[in-house]
A protein has these predicted regions:
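C-terminal motif of bacterial Sec signal peptides marking the signal peptidase cleavage site
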Residues: 13-16
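Noncatalytic modules at the cell exterior or secretory-pathway interfaces
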Residues: 50-57, 118-134
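Exposed low-complexity, polar/acidic, P/S/T/G-rich flexible segments that act as propeptides
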Residues: 72-77, 135-158
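Bacterial signal peptide processing site
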Residues: 18-21
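Sec-dependent signal peptide recognition
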Residues: 2-9
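Short acidic/polar inter-strand loop motif in beta-rich domains
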Residues: 63-64, 109-119, 131-142
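An anionic, turn-rich surface loop/hairpin at beta-sheet edges
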Residues: 88-119
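Post-signal-peptide N-terminal segment of Sec-exported extracytoplasmic proteins
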Residues: 38-67
Length: 158
């Protein structure tokens, strides 16, 4: 193989390797359905209160998921015992019904930016409780819900 081709391949491989997440956890959801009272709990520890981070929600479902979106209720829990609630609409399909995420086989993966460039104000253990906020209960075909914490990359995210 010519040296310049090898160099190009190595440069491409290295460029595609991103920084690993600070935390990545995925919770499995029963394929029998996700009931609204089923709360998925995520925890992580923060020591550096100056580092800017991005908080992302991962959703994996199969092709039979019957809706174009998924509403989730989020409860953030802080080390000092306080909490904050939020509601997020995750758009999973476009107007034509085509999934916006990527997938392999029957599964489709989506990643949603919940908070960008946040600085956690306190050292200690944080938590996030996730439950669905859809009208129908249970909702079918959701396989996993995940949470990722990554070093903030500036304005490079969509």
């Amino acid at each position: 193989m010519k040296p310049w081709i090898w160099t190009l391949l190595m440069a491409t491989a290295l460029a595609s390797c991103g920084e690993p997440p600070l935390m990545a956890v995925s919770k499995e959801v029963s394929m029998d359905g996700w009931f609204s009272e089923e709360r998925l709990l995520f925890h992580w520890d923060v020591q550096d209160t100056l580092q800017r981070q991005d908080l992302l929600l991962d959703i994996r479902h199969d092709q039979t998921y019957p809706y174009s979106n998924l509403y989730v209720f989020l409860t953030y829990r802080y080390p000092n015992g306080r909490s904050r609630m939020d509601t997020v609409e995750c758009t999973l399909a476009n107007e034509r019904g085509e999934w916006r995420g990527s997938g392999f086989g029957d599964l489709v993966d989506h990643r949603f930016l919940l908070q960008s460039g946040i600085q956690f104000p306190l050292r200690g253990r944080y938590g996030l409780e996730v439950r669905h906020g859809m009208r129908h209960d249970p909702i079918p075909a959701v396989a996993n819900i995940g949470l990722r914490l990554e070093a903030h990359q500036g304005d490079s995210r969509p």
